[in-house]
Amino acid sequence: MTRHPSRPTPQTIPRSDAAARGLEEPAIETVLFDTHKWVGFVAVVANGIAGIVCLVAWRVVRWRGRWVWILTIVAEVLFLFDVVVGTALVAAYKFKPPGIHMFYGFLVFITVGLAFQYRESMRGRTELLYGLVGLFLMGLGIRAVFQVV
């Protein structure tokens, strides 16, 4: 019967040795890029849903309520967050997006700002305004995705 040599006691790997042994955590730019990609997809879908819900709420009074505005705000904030993450990728990590991808992000910020500015002048038709804005943002997002894919 042969004896197996005893295993060495496990030791914690110092941070500096982690990369040498292949145990490196993903780089922050990889995490930001994946976040930008997936939040972008979610924001496109969320703005499409929010746009349709707002248009239905404009026509059907029963549908109006706080939940419509919460959905709309969450959808728009997702897009704004996605634009900020994309801006961080370009500014800090020198990512070069193709075509006019960055222009679509700029348009998202402008559109959300203009919609917020015009909400007072659209009293009684605010759901219509935000429904059209949600669908427009969805279209911008789809165009931005097709610039990359």
Task: List where the protein language model places each region.
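Cytoplasmic-side transmembrane-helix entry/capping segments in multi-pass membrane proteins
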Residues: W67-I73, R125-G134
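Final/C-terminal transmembrane alpha-helix of multipass membrane proteins
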Residues: Y130-Q147
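N-terminal signal-anchor/start-transfer transmembrane helix
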Residues: A43-V60
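Membrane-helix boundary connector in multi-pass membrane proteins
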Residues: A91-F95, G113-L128, V145-V149
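Structural signature of hydrophobic alpha-helical transmembrane segments
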Residues: G40-V45, F95-L107
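Loop-to-helix transition at the N-terminal end of transmembrane alpha-helices
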Residues: W63-F79, I100-H101
